[in-house]
Amino acid sequence: MSQYQQGYGDQTRRVDEYGNPLTSQGQVDQYGNPISGGGMTGATGHGHGHHQQHHGVGVDQTTGFGSNTGTGTGYGTHTGSGGTHTGGVGGYGTTTEYGSTNTGSGYGNTDIGGTGYGTGTGTGTTGYGATGGGTGVGYGGTGHDNRGVMDKIKEKIPGTDQNASTYGTGTGYGTTGIGHQQHGGDNRGVMDKIKEKIPGTDQNQYTHGTGTGTGTGYGTTGYGASGVGHQQHGEKGVMDKIKEKIPGTEQNTYGTGTGTGHGTTGYGSTGTGHGTTGYGDEQHHGEKKGIMEKIKEKLPGTGSCTGHGQGH
């Protein structure tokens, strides 16, 4: 045996590039496939598979998974002196990738509008109504003479002028002031009355009654008074009436009552102010005189004037 071994020598054991022993029989490639052929055995081809990983895209609140099958085909070609060897086909690899999807839930802050309360302040304006004014008109009334026939005849005689004038003027707001004038009956004798009838004698009686009332009210107009003049003629005897009929004699009796009332208009609650009525009263009372004194009054040139009475 040794000679054989020495004759042929010990053959060096060959291995491939990966360290696999190379034999003429029973050689396998890197995948374990048997290699057959004569001559020199080429290097074993290597197949490399390429694999791509795919990640599944997760949906919100869902776990996604993706499957991928990678196919790798590798050809290893080695040309040796003994022949050509083609490596086997690469294997198949299947990879299943599971991707977990993070689910993020975002919550936005909700602004809730509060209820605002506004306080409004209103200023009410109080209106004031104007107060109407009333105008009172005074009335002047003439009294009636309760005289006899002769007295009335004298009034009819031409040239005699007997004026009985009474003026009542009321100007104001409200009630009117009243002026009264009265001529009392003369309780005189016959001669006294004859003197009044003598021509040239002038007996004028003037009486002024002035009433002034001032009323002040708040709201409603105050009321004052305006005057009314009244005139009355006293009862006279027969001779007195005859004298009034004699031409040239003039007996004038003037009664004037003037009342003025002012009402002041106020604002607010209604009040009523009343003006006090002024009265002017004048009365002529009959004088009980002797016969000579009455005759003296009847003499021409003598005048009997009675003054003014004024009441406020």
UniProtKB/Swiss-Prot annotation:
Q: Where is this protein localized, as stated in its record?
A: Cytoplasm
The record's Gene Ontology biological-process terms are: cold acclimation; nodulation; response to abscisic acid; response to cold; response to heat; response to water deprivation
Q: Which Pfam families match?
A: Dehydrin
Comp. bias intervals (Gly residues): 35-46, 67-88, 256-278
**Gene Ontology CC annotation, any one:** cytoplasm
Tissue spec. comment: Expressed in nodules and roots.
Residue ranges with Polar residues bias = 21-30
Q: Explain what the UniProt record notes about the effect of disrupting the gene for this protein.
A: Reduced nitrogenase activity in root nodules, lower ATP/ADP ratio, increased expression of nodule senescence genes and higher accumulation of amyloplasts under dehydration conditions.
Composition-biased stretches, type Low complexity, lie in: 55-66
Supply the alphabetized keyword list: Cytoplasm, Nodulation, Stress response
What induces this one? Answer: By cold.
- Asked if Membrane is a keyword of the record, the answer is no
Q: Which InterPro entries match?
A: Dehydrin, Dehydrin_CS
Segments of this protein annotated with the region Disordered: 1-88, 248-287
Function description: Intrinsically disordered protein acting as a chaperone. Ensures leghemoglobins (e.g. LB120-1) protection from denaturation under thermal and drought stresses to delay root nodule nitrogenase inactivation and subsequent nodule senescence, thus supporting symbiotic nitrogen fixation (SNF).
Q: Oligomeric state and partners?
A: Interacts with the leghemoglobin LB120-1 in the cytoplasm; this interaction leads to LB120-1 protection from denaturation under thermal and drought stresses.
What family does this chain come from, according to its entry?
Belongs to the plant dehydrin family.
Under which name does UniProt file this protein? Dehydrin CAS31
Q: What is the lineage of its organism?
A: Eukaryota, Viridiplantae, Streptophyta, Embryophyta, Tracheophyta
